[in-house]
Amino acid sequence: MQIRCLIVDDNQAFLDAARLLLEREGVAVVGLATTSAEALRLEEELRPDVVLVDIRLGDESGFELALQLSGTVIMISTHAQREYAEDLAASPAAGFIPKALLSASALLRLAGVN
């Protein structure tokens, strides 16, 4: 079964690059969102298996969005995980992937898919 993923980031260039990378590695990227409101709408409409959420969504917080999402959430950022250790521990996120290390294998491992 192919994993279905929604990616949430306020940077369109990153969204396009991440989609291309993950689709080349066999992930079905079912949607892209640049705001929390758009992400919530798309999650309900598309029912992805996992949602990748940027920690900093412009003026919005990816952690606040993670609390509102119903599915599996993995946080992403260009910044190091140690900067967000407390927030990550308190969030419902299944894990964290630095944007530079984003891959289908990392996503599948954190989402609990073998």
What are these regions (language model features)?
Residues 9, 54:
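Active-site residues of response regulator receiver
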Residues 58, 81:
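The feature encodes the CheY-like receiver
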Residues 76-77, 99:
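Hydrophobic/aromatic residues positioned on beta-strands within the core alpha/beta folds
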Residues 83, 100-111:
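C-terminal output helix
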